[in-house]
Amino acid sequence: ILAYCAFVIFMYLLYHILTLVSTCSKADFFTFFGEVQKKDGHSACMCTCWNMTDEENYCEIEAPVARGEKNLRTATKQAAEKLIDEGRLGGYLAYASGTPIGWCNANDKSCYPRLMSAHPSMEGQVKCIMCFEVLPDHRNCGVASALLRHICDDARRAGYTCVEAYPNKCNMLSENDYEHMVHIYREAGFLCESRNNQDVWVKKIKEEKI
């Protein structure tokens, strides 16, 4: 029964995922992270970390907070809004009954300045997946898998040659989270490559039409 319910939710979500590419969905982005803050209490970064240079992070978040000009949440929200407006922070929101319940930070590799130095790009266009976040009430229901499938399909339509993911243990809340994400990537056809002593999960995108 549980497996069937998960499958039904999975299929439903496949058609209720929106690409965060314009200001029209900013409200849903911040609504979602507001819920994460209330239910999990760990949404401080709002997925801005990898999209900012060290200098930007210091000038726009760390310094204003240290000077007492802004609290961390306000500074981070303003930084996230700027990144979205500039097209540097992008990703996908999953919805249930019109409410955002899941998020994945995924975009062109050039949008992640910190990542570019740690994981040099392969030839051709590369779409990167940085992190997933799902509201507690909707976890273990296939939300992340639905998002991942949609991202790979979207990357294929956009002409990307591959999708890369970096489920580093130090970025996960627990060992179980890491193992769970590795399982999801493996099930989606990703293969593990070792680069600079770190695991990178890669899915080659075929040129065939879908």
Region locations from a protein language model:
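C-terminal "cap" of GNAT-fold acetyltransferases
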Residues: 176-210
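Conserved acetyl-CoA-binding loop-helix of GNAT-fold acetyltransferases
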Residues: 134, 140-156
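Conserved N-terminal entry element of GNAT/NAT acetyltransferase domains
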Residues: 8, 14-63, 208-210
